[in-house]
């Protein structure tokens, strides 16, 4: 599916889930996904909405699908569609609870889908999502797609659910060695691959300072561009859109071995942010 073509209905309102650039209530966000240079199908999907999605004031998602010729594409797209539907219909109001329960719900749906259709057998997807509310960021992740906080420096907030990350934590591998390790693509958690709690997401809550940024991305970016260069590109770029496009171009220039997805968010607060949100 072309990167700019997919439209979804957000609680009765249409929104695009591949490339978006909005400025609403001092939250700027731009996202883009690219097939890369070595793949013929883009199995990544992204979702960007600075508008409310159900009880959530905004929502940003990167999903990196896997499994079979078409199944990875289906898994990432359906995961986002199902999560948005869940967010639109749940009666819960706490962002962390919505992220946690929503991911567990879509895990079962995708698992059942994979087991009822031979073409989708073995499919699954990573999932990293973020919601900004009242100066806090609520984050959930399953797999090795990441969220970075860019303030005074760049900081990886999420922890990869991967074999090499476990090896780094056990002291068996250096962090830089993990980037090029032959098992770097082996993940230990994914949505849709099992019915049990192996898809339970990590949930984080952090504060975000005025003007700081968040980056959600798939491993197609981080395997090709080191954190230092990601930080440098974001700081030197004239806009968040320019930064995202440069990040993707750099990943392709460095080999483009996988699909590449990135969402960059900038939060700028005003005194009347809550009242502005209620007027929309």
Give a label for each model feature.
Residues 2-280:
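PP2C/PPM-type serine/threonine phosphatase catalytic domain
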